Amino acid sequence: MKPQMIPGIITGITAYVASTLIASGVIPMKSFLVLIPVMSITMIVELYRKQEKPFDSLAHTFFSVLYTALPFSMFPFSAFSRTGLNSLLPHPDITFSPGIIIGFFLLIWANDTGAYLTGVSFGRHRLMERISPKKSWEGFFGGVLLAIIVAWFLSGWLGVVDKTHWIIIAVIVSLAGTYGDLIESMLKRSTGVKDSGTIMPGHGGLLDRFDSAIISFPLVYLFLSLFG
């Protein structure tokens, strides 16, 4: 079984580029419809590939797009307005304001750093040993604590949203980011690979640098869209 790598990459790039152009007001929201023929062509191509399990091939191809491209396609909507929600509406004065994205990644790094340092120093109780033997509950709570501290500083430095919102975002990032790590580890184990790619071998692959963001940013975006 071999997924369609090139069509998958094209679909993912198309989704991200369309999101950026829509969020910045260059093209209308209906431009997302361009994904329909792209996905249809992918399914048609599968007819001619003569794979033993075409369903598995298509499932892997489209899941890869859903897992990676969809979350990152939400970043432009957050960067071109205060929370991203306004970019979905007619907005004559759309501005580029990446504060949420900058703060988001700082919180991810704070959570990872806090979890690592606390886990190495005090980790005794395994979080989910069958998936990730090194993760501990002590590390998890250490990551949450450091992320909340950083969120407190971000509220004064970046602003964008108030202190309470930043702290809630920190908790979302810590919880969902941890699940993101575990899900990516689960997927790698299920396919029998150590690294998610040839880039950055020995460190889990390039995807390991973003697995926390894949799960947590859509939830942060949802929170800000509803309550920001």
How does the language model describe each region?
Residues 221-228:
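Juxtamembrane boundary at the C-terminal end of a transmembrane helix
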